[in-house]
């Protein structure tokens, strides 16, 4: 068969069916045309020689999306988990619209669903919209099977004939997961009546194809009063097949005896399940599972009776790790208290249980007799044949609660009468202790004020970075430096230059330099004041910490330790600010020399140091013979002290190094 690849691409380009698969093509080099050429006989693609008419909207068609194809090395593809795919109406592109005059007599090949739509004069575009909704619903999902497509095409609901009179409806949704083992879940919701399920015929399923049979078996066990019931059969991979019966009863106690089921779970109620084959049982209290196994039947009856019917009206203690919601726990406790107090079980005609614990089975007659004996021994007033109304049960319960409150009130009165009276001597001792405490408070009131001030100043003091790393700069506080820029101009004899091109820049720089020095001086005062306050607080608080007298605390403010401590901190701060201001002065001096070189070349000459400057530099060099070449901070301090620029200091030490080398060689 000859296939026009271009027409096939046009038809398939908008198909959303492939978008529902999340797989990727293994061979990326395999072309789309090769796939359709080798799979042309696939029932999804059955094009005739006549291609579909072009779409009415001349818009660029999107590229085909990736789909889940299992390919071999020869690009032979096959759909995964679909040995026999149904004829899908999704062959029509959902991205294109066709003329409305299409009819069933057209020469174009359609799927059965398309032909049905055309015979009924239905609009294909509306049908395609439904397909898009369906595909979007199952997009990015791996739980897709042919059953969904069959249900979608047939568009039918599974109605149960036995429940048509009650206007009940059922939905049958099968979800298959690739595994041979399954889990069957039956949800029975009964909101008004007692539900007594004796499921002796629920067998475990071994194949994935038994889901519909399980639905029929479960529907026959449903009561006619259940108007809205949904059966959901979900097959989940598991090595052990088991049947799980979930019963929700919101108003009454639900007791179920399943001879073949291994586990019985009852949400929101107390459920007791007996397994006659293995003598094992499971007591499930709402969402808290208490599993007890391998216990004789007689012990089980006794423990069950003691758990539900307690003489002291004590409710079951639920596990704290899995707390129930408040509504369920309160309703369960109240129900159990009423059943303990009244012990009334009605007959089958009144839609209640025929026996106190289990159904009336021949195999359990002797066991149920043991239950009667146990309950009668614990409470002689218990009569299994007695049936009280709900109003009588409430009255009895209220009477019991009133009796309990009266007993508690009497016990409290007895306890109050037996309390020992406090002697008068003890009251006198308490008053004396209170007076002593008040005296101590008044005595140390001043100390408390000092402590509060100390803490407040510590908080303020911590906001200032007063103590930077200035170990190497601690020695710079002792230098007496004149930071006025006029001293540098006079020492360099720059004041004699009268050119306006030189004076204006110098005046401009001098203004900004002076303002910067004023700001630094103000910052020094701001940072020094907290140090004074902090040291003062230390001098006041130190006697309190050492438990010294108040008289010595006044004299300790001027102690040598406090004054030395204050001076050391202030010297550290002073050293830092001297270095900063020295950088400002030497850098400004370098700028002045650059201005002199540009605007007053005739006044530029070799700057010779004065005798005072030369003497100071030699003294510093001799004092640091072991390390005669200073760091950058030391250079700017020497330049600020001797009114030299940074470049002049560098040149002097460079020349000094060369002289030392020449002197050593001559020696």
UniProtKB/Swiss-Prot annotation:
Principal localisation: nucleus
SMART domains: HOX
Keywords: Coiled coil, Developmental protein, DNA-binding, Homeobox, Nucleus, Transcription, Transcription regulation
GO BP annotations, alphabetical order: cell development; regulation of transcription by RNA polymerase II
Annotated region described as Disordered, given as residue ranges: 44-108, 179-232, 249-268, 331-418
Biased composition (Basic residues): 334-343
Keyword Transcription regulation (UniProt): yes
Induction: Up-regulated by phagocytic stimuli.
Pfam families in the record: Homeobox_KN
Protein location: Nucleus
Entry superkingdom: Eukaryota
Coiled-coil annotated residue ranges, if any: 386-454
GO cellular component: nucleus
DNA-binding region, residues: 602-664
Skewed-composition ranges (Polar residues): 75-96, 380-390
Low complexity bias spans: 97-108, 344-379
Composition bias, Pro residues: 52-63
GO terms assigned for molecular function: DNA-binding transcription factor activity, RNA polymerase II-specific; RNA polymerase II cis-regulatory region sequence-specific DNA binding
Function: Putative transcription factor.
The protein's name: Homeobox protein 3
């Amino acid at each position: 068969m000859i296939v026009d690849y271009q027409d096939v691409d046009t038809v398939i380009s908008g198909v959303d069916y492939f978008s529902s698969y999340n797989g990727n093509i293994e061979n990326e080099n395999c072309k789309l045309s090769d796939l359709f050429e080798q799979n042309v006989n696939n029932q999804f693609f059955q094009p005739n020689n006549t291609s579909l008419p072009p779409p009415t909207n001349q818009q660029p068609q999107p590229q085909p999306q990736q789909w889940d194809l299992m390919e071999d090395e020869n690009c032979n593809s096959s759909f995964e988990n679909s040995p026999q795919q149904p004829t899908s109406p999704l062959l029509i592109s959902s991205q294109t619209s066709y003329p409305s005059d299409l009819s069933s007599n057209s020469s174009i090949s359609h799927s059965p669903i398309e032909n049905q739509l055309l015979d009924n004069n239905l609009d294909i575009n509306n049908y395609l919209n439904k397909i898009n909704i369906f595909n979007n619903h199952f997009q990015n999902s791996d739980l897709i099977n042919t059953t969904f497509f069959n249900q979608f095409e047939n568009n039918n609901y599974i109605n149960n004939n036995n429940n048509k009179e009650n206007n009940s409806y059922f939905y049958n949704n099968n979800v298959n997961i690739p595994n041979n083992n399954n889990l069957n879940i039956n949800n029975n919701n009964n909101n008004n009546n007692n539900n007594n399920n004796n499921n002796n015929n629920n067998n475990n399923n071994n194949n994935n194809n038994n889901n519909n049979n399980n639905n029929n078996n479960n529907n026959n066990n449903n009561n006619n009063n259940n108007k809205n019931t949904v059966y959901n059969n979900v097959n989940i991979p598991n090595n052990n097949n088991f049947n799980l019966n979930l019963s929700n009863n919101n108003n009454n106690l639900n007791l179920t005896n399943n001879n073949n089921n291994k586990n019985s779970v009852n949400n929101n109620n107390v459920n007791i399940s007996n397994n006659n084959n293995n003598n094992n049982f499971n007591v499930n209290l709402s969402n808290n599972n208490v599993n007890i196994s391998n216990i004789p039947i007689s012990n089980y009856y006794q423990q069950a009776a003691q758990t539900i019917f307690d003489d002291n009206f004590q409710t079951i203690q639920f596990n704290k790790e899995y707390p129930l919601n408040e509504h369920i726990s309160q309703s369960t406790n109240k129900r159990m208290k009423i059943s303990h107090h009244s012990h009334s079980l009605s007959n089958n005609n009144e839609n209640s249980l025929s026996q106190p614990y289990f159904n009336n089975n021949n195999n359990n007659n002797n066991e149920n007799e043991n239950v009667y004996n146990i309950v009668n021994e614990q409470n002689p007033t218990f009569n299994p044949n007695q049936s009280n109304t709900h109003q009588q049960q409430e009255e009895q319960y209220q009477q019991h609660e009133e009796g309990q409150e009266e007993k508690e009130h009497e016990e409290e009165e007895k306890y109050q009468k037996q309390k020992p009276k406090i002697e008068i001597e003890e009251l006198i001792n308490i008053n004396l202790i209170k007076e002593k405490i008040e005296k101590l408070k008044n005595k140390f009131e001043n100390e408390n004020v000092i402590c509060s001030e100390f803490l407040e100043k510590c908080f303020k003091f911590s906001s200032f970075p007063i103590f930077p790393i200035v170990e190497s700069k601690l020695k710079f506080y002792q230098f007496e430096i004149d930071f006025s820029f006029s001293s540098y101009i006079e020492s360099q004899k720059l004041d004699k230059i009268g050119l306006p091109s030189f004076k204006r820049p110098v005046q401009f720089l001098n203004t900004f330099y002076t303002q910067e020095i004023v700001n630094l001086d103000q910052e020094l005062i701001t940072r020094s004041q907290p140090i004074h306050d902090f040291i003062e607080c230390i001098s006041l608080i130190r006697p309190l910490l050492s438990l010294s007298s108040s008289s010595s605390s006044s004299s300790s403010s001027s102690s040598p330790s406090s004054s030395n401590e204050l001076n050391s901190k202030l010297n550290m701060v002073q050293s830092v600010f001297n270095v900063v201001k020295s950088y400002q002065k030497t850098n400004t001096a370098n700028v002045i020399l650059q201005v002199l070189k540009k605007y007053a070349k005739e006044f530029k000459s070799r700057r010779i140091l004065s005798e005072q400057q030369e003497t100071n530099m030699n003294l510093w060099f001799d004092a640091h013979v072991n390390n005669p070449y200073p760091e950058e901070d030391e250079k700017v301090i020497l330049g600020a002290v001797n009114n030299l620029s940074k470049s002049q200091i560098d040149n002097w030490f460079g020349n000094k190094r060369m002289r030392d080398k020449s002197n050593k060689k001559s020696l």
